[in-house]
């Protein structure tokens, strides 16, 4: 096998990428590792595979190998004391760990000690406000139950003055390993429950957790222009972490109550405006309530029809992080009086006589009827 060059040993082309080299190496290493096969020449082939990969995975060595050729590179390595792999065997667990990670989507646990600190959970709070509060923005006080950092042990979980020791069963790793053939199975350490350390004297107030539950009060700022369904994040205001871990976040979900007058359409507001049939016919000026409080004057054009829409610009909702406002759209609702005085009836009868095109049997009346459907 060693009569072949390193590319041939790994079964790849000279233009192979590092990913292709690693893939080929892992496949051959799995096949020829002495721990996985009883083949007579397995150890020899395994050494050759490692020798080839050791050179080709290093860009500088690979460049020299390509420039000098196999024999010249070997001679230079021998003179320089390189290229001697002796009886070195990479750990089969490392090979299989890489193999499963690359080809089966697995992951490998680091052998370094893990921290016992655990981040706290995020919390969600549903807050209902009215439309005026959404327009102006408001500071709201909310109350909720949450895990908070223990003020006795300051989150360590240990009694004051007591030290936290590394677990001797797992050496601080948090897991123990069990050999099954040539596979290694990891499981959470039974002694420290995967924490990697032992608290000999747990804090009495928090029972070693570094936190405890209590009712919290928090002031939250709701910005002007917030919309229904907006989620506001308050970093670090969620549950306290376990044994000094970082706190989670608090998410406040905003719901806006329906308004008695206005209907919301994005940043625009819609409202129905009752006007008399006299104002609709003659035109006029009326006062309209606006969301910020107070009233503004609205001019009604003569001949306004029921359902006509008039726009008040920049009188809608405010927008978050913007000075621009939406509009208010008023929908005319022409009111016809039900109870007329004698004088009102006389005037209307006179108006009726003076009206033109009022005959209900002429063509213009039926044309008007048809136009209402268009």
From Swiss-Prot:
GO terms for cellular component: cytoplasm. CDD domains: DnaJ, DnaJ_C, DnaJ_zf. One of its GO terms (molecular function) is zinc ion binding. Signal peptide: none annotated. It is found in: Cytoplasm. Its cofactor is Zn(2+). CXXCXGXG motif repeats lie at residues 150-157, 167-174, 189-196, 203-210. Keywords: Chaperone, Cytoplasm, DNA replication, Metal-binding, Repeat, Stress response, Zinc, Zinc-finger. PROSITE patterns: DNAJ_1 (PS00636), DNAJ_2 (PS50076), ZF_CR (PS51188). InterPro entries: DnaJ, DnaJ_C, DnaJ_domain, DnaJ_domain_CS, HSP40/DnaJ_pept-bd, HSP_DnaJ_Cys-rich_dom, HSP_DnaJ_Cys-rich_dom_sf, J_dom_sf. GO terms for biological process: chaperone cofactor-dependent protein refolding; DNA replication; protein refolding; response to heat. Zn(2+) 2 binds at residues 167, 170, 189, 192. Binds 2 Zn(2+) ions per monomer. Zn(2+) 1 binds at residues 150, 153, 203, 206. Participates actively in the response to hyperosmotic and heat shock by preventing the aggregation of stress-denatured proteins and by disaggregating proteins, also in an autonomous, DnaK-independent fashion. Unfolded proteins bind initially to DnaJ; upon interaction with the DnaJ-bound protein, DnaK hydrolyzes its bound ATP, resulting in the formation of a stable complex. GrpE releases ADP from DnaK; ATP binding to DnaK triggers the release of the substrate protein, thus completing the reaction cycle. Belongs to the DnaJ family. The J domain is necessary and sufficient to stimulate DnaK ATPase activity. Zinc center 1 plays an important role in the autonomous, DnaK-independent chaperone activity of DnaJ. Zinc center 2 is essential for interaction with DnaK and for DnaJ activity. This is Chaperone protein DnaJ.
